[in-house]
């Protein structure tokens, strides 16, 4: 007998307005209240506030709600610095005073470590810099608006594919922010504006970089308009006609300097978004490693050599491991350009066993790792097996740092120092650093 598929009925959501007391922030900086002992996550609400909410999602274990209005405001609330804050998906903590953001993030880091059973340790002072004008990179979305026949130019709305039109962003470095208005005007004047994908702006130490993704070739007039714009403003121009093709059209090769080392990059490469915090982060990592001239250091997830190259100036040998082949080539080139012959880079998938790798038999005295948000679960057993004296773990996700810390501690290491770096002010994200010693 044939059976017909019957889709489950979509669970209905109680849309009545409800008054709640917000008790704390979650790990993504949404306010948490409790209704019938079940947590309700409320974007934009702060602890000690009373709020009128409306459910937008109700699950068995939790609910999500929209903030309708506040009947009692926290003394720690402030007016957002950006006119687009309520709509733009970039920042989600501008309504909380910056000093309180630091406290909340520090608490989040400590709580996650404690939840994983990691014992308390020496907590370093948070590393801070400017809370505004800090982002040296921005990806600007472009969509053709059929009603206006103009490009929508800006950032994605919160939980949406729609675009918030932006001409000024207070968290962008001023060198990039100053170009938003004129860039919007230029792109809308191009004949081929319908064929634009997105735009990226990156601030290098030797100038501002403009990357334009386009899906059809520019005509001669459009090419000249782009070139004239960049010449007039001394911008470095890259065009990307395909996702894996990058053409350097105008200007110098971009680089940034850290600890007197020049690190060259392309606008497709990952670099830390906050230059000032990155400088402090590298300096702190090198200090925590307590380096000497005889050390042999392994740098995992090394990228372009952000840590490897400064390390090479202070120790006997550095080996950098990176999963992306193009990044490895660029790191090797950076070492050569900086005349550092005691650092070697290899490409390897760090989620796979590395016993057969040529570098795995080296006796490393110290290890540094700086993985992506997914963490380094696949490599932690290897780190422990190599038995370094010291491990410094740099993390952009405290949840995976807490998880991975357990693996080292189980193998005889002790967490001796932990610190937060305010890499992403006005967002729920945080950078952290942990020191493990045998």
UniProtKB/Swiss-Prot annotation:
The gene is rlmD. Keywords: 4Fe-4S, Iron, Iron-sulfur, Metal-binding, Methyltransferase, rRNA processing, S-adenosyl-L-methionine, Transferase. The lineage of its organism: Bacteria, Pseudomonadati, Pseudomonadota, Gammaproteobacteria, Vibrionales. S-adenosyl-L-methionine binds at residues 272, 301, 306, 322, 349, 370. GO terms for biological process: rRNA base methylation. Pfam families: TRAM (PF01938), tRNA_U5-meth_tr (PF05958). InterPro entries: 23S_rRNA_MeTrfase_RlmD, MeTrfase_TrmA_AS, MeTrfase_TrmA_CS, NA-bd_OB-fold, SAM-dependent_MTases_sf, TRAM_dom, U5_MeTrfase_fam. One of its GO terms (molecular function) is 4 iron, 4 sulfur cluster binding. The active site is at residue 396. Its EC number is 2.1.1.190. It is an enzyme of class 2 (transferase). It comes from the Bacteria. The keyword Manganese does not apply. Belongs to the class I-like SAM-binding methyltransferase superfamily. RNA M5U methyltransferase family. RlmD subfamily. This is 23S rRNA (uracil(1939)-C(5))-methyltransferase RlmD. It catalyses: uridine(1939) in 23S rRNA + S-adenosyl-L-methionine = 5-methyluridine(1939) in 23S rRNA + S-adenosyl-L-homocysteine + H(+). [4Fe-4S] cluster binds at residues 82, 88, 91, 169. PANTHER family: 23S RRNA (URACIL(1939)-C(5))-METHYLTRANSFERASE RLMD, RNA M5U METHYLTRANSFERASE. Residues 10-69 form the TRAM domain. Catalyzes the formation of 5-methyl-uridine at position 1939 (m5U1939) in 23S rRNA.
